[in-house]
């Protein structure tokens, strides 16, 4: 690889670096050389991660070489002075050793927000000349553990405790093999191992990947880990992370302030305390009944005594009493107290700095005890309430008494009323069905009273960064594509910063089209503020804008909304008006789901749909998963539409207190933002992050459309990334919609003619699903292998398998209700990620796991489509290939094209004959039933059918009459009677008898 001298250090880069990459690497090396901190912004697509890794590891390698040469020189000098006497030699050796310890080569800790981002960084490292340097990634037990008993546990905390239990009892064979297998060539090989590689090697060697990875840390030049391992003191201690003389790199640091604040904040509920009291009471009953189970060997002393339990229960009862006594003046919004209130509250129950460590140790032992006991009884919880209490004590008493004045300025206690249903659910979710307590027990009353939530919130992110500096790190480098403006970030983190950088983008101006769209095609102002967001004219105009843009933008179109409620509101309105169908005629629409399982399959479907000539449209939310670090390079994202500014909820207690904290602590010296400036910046940073989904590399191109008139405000523009500001000019103004359409069309025409079109790309899997030997039916699926429509039981990702099992359960012969999700599925949405929707919520599109909604049609004037199965490509194809190739073909509502050998008419191609109908039964699945209805009636009839169902679900008895008339009209033909009969199961109970009478009368005629 080419060698470049940057800041005096030879750096091997995979290619000749661009100027922005040189500038970036120079800043990194200067930080490492001088032992200073840096805040570096470089837009997504400029090779930031590659530059960061190459620069830091080049400096490390140079230091290693220099130290090796220095030590060799000292050894030669000592040999020459060997005749000078033993005393002199010992003195020289001591001096050399002392200097060497102080001069040791630093190690790199590379931290990012998610494991997928860490995996991406490790893939970048494999491309470099530094791929042979020692590296390791730290992951959770949830990702690395291969013990079947641990993996069966639900929730990360239960897995952690089960693992600790087995290790303590020496019953985990995988962990016991670590010592004998840790030097195996497969494990110590030169290749870089990410999470999946560690799991595969662990399975092959029958060795625990979680504990084995820790064996590599001491010898590693660079260690990859998520933020919480670094910033959470408890996680740092558990993973034995040494920070002294290390280089800490925080990549994707645009949310670092919030992460620091959250790592120092904690919450406890009245129901948590009540459950902890119940758990202790039950353990005491076991002890007094003589059934106690000792987790240790027969000769080991008990980990705790009955006296320990009695004392802890008394303390918890006092804590419960103290929480009950807290006054909440404003029951709607809660009441705020100074930070000292949490210490007073805990002090009433005798929780203090002096006994905190002892109590936390006892709580850990109780969790271990319950983990053992719960293996023998399903009546027991697993100590979740003890873990909540331990977290509270660890965080509250982590701040030393000598910094209490700073704690009082930076923390607040906010007390809310715990929703009665919520507290009961919390108590009942893990509570044994027969109950543990007698009627007179004091603990039971806490849930039925006005239960409370005690929040201990940190508003000073400098606390987290101060911990790193106090651990004597060499350098801290914060970097991201969206850090601007840098000054307020540096001020909030309160760390000395010697190097800062705001890089321009790597692409030419002609590759990016940026415009503010202040009005829609109908000249209605586009402004998504609180007053206007419910305006039907605004919502319609926004939909018309997206429709017009979708006609021009090739391939992938991303649309970001300020919030989920706003996305829901627009979807509902556009579906009612027909705009949704019009947009989906141009591009199939995908919605960002909230669940993890559905998210992966949805993204894979979207990437697959991009290969179609129409492309696809993805509607997502700022600050959601799609806006954070996903790859929409090239065809996957040719344009991004920002529909509004995602301001945080103005009256949210945490937002109110954050603004108040800034106003109170702001001075000319510390340069903190005002509360309003912070509020505006929080929204703009989310916009910057969403914009960064497009333009992912040097040869990429795309459009950025800011569809909110407020983007014209200079105060808002100044907070956008520097490279975006360059495209908007000194005085940004919105342009009329007509000229924008012409310019946008010309932009893409010119780009397609002048830019090299990308080759077909294989998108990396979004969430790496680790293949476990214990689960042979779960196969890892990359996007290059994904099959959009599959038969149940044919393999695929564990998310897909879970979805199929849910779908199979849904097909049980029970009375079910209709939801709009079913209506959408009938019109072509994916079956992946489907679950039984809320029976009472007719408008729960986004709460249901609908992964994609595609009302695609060949005719822009038609709203819906017919769905047919594609024929097998070959009669001799194998069974597996037939399954893999199975798709639903989306076609228009016009005449169907037929094979030459078929009759010319098409009516019989989708309407069964009377003879056929005698043999047919209506599909059990709602979605399949709707698809069949859709395939046998025309577009207008199906639209009326859907509206009648919606009206019936939400309306009164009169709506049944309307529905009945329509059913007899559209499904009354003899060959469709099986569908008419099938409708009975979806009716309300009070209408079924009348349905039977009407149907009998209809058949008689």
From Swiss-Prot:
Region (Disordered): 893-917
Key word Transport present: no
GO BP, sorted A to Z: DNA recombination; DNA repair; DNA replication; male germ-line stem cell population maintenance; negative regulation of DNA recombination; negative regulation of t-circle formation; regulation of double-strand break repair via homologous recombination; telomeric loop disassembly
Primary site of residence: nucleus
Catalytic activity: ATP + H2O = ADP + phosphate + H(+)
EC code: 5.6.2.-
Keyword set, alphabetical order: 4Fe-4S, ATP-binding, DNA damage, DNA repair, DNA-binding, Helicase, Hydrolase, Iron, Iron-sulfur, Isomerase, Metal-binding, Nucleotide-binding, Nucleus, Phosphoprotein
Positions annotated to bind ATP: 42-49
SUPFAM superfamilies, per database record: P-loop containing nucleoside triphosphate hydrolases (SSF52540)
Entry's Gene Ontology cellular component terms: nucleus
Binding annotation for [4Fe-4S] cluster: 145, 163, 172, 208
Domain of life: Eukaryota
Keyword DNA damage: yes
Listed GO MF terms: 4 iron, 4 sulfur cluster binding; ATP binding; ATP hydrolysis activity; chromatin binding; DNA binding; DNA helicase activity; DNA polymerase binding; metal ion binding
Phosphothreonine, modified sites: 876
Domain Helicase ATP-binding: 7-322
Short sequence motif DEAH box: positions: 251-254
InterPro entries xref list: ATP-dep_Helicase_C (IPR006555), DinG/Rad3-like (IPR045028), Helic_SF1/SF2_ATP-bd_DinG/Rad3 (IPR014013), Helicase-like_DEXD_c2 (IPR006554), HHD_RTEL1 (IPR049909), P-loop_NTPase (IPR027417), RAD3-like_helicase_DEAD (IPR010614), Rad3/Chl1-like (IPR013020)
Compartments reported by the entry: Nucleus
Main function: A probable ATP-dependent DNA helicase implicated in DNA repair and the maintenance of genomic stability. Acts as an anti-recombinase to counteract toxic recombination and limit crossover during meiosis. Regulates meiotic recombination and crossover homeostasis by physically dissociating strand invasion events and thereby promotes noncrossover repair by meiotic synthesis dependent strand annealing (SDSA) as well as disassembly of D loop recombination intermediates.
Similarity field: Belongs to the helicase family. RAD3/XPD subfamily.
Entry protein name: Regulator of telomere elongation helicase 1 homolog
Native organism: Drosophila virilis
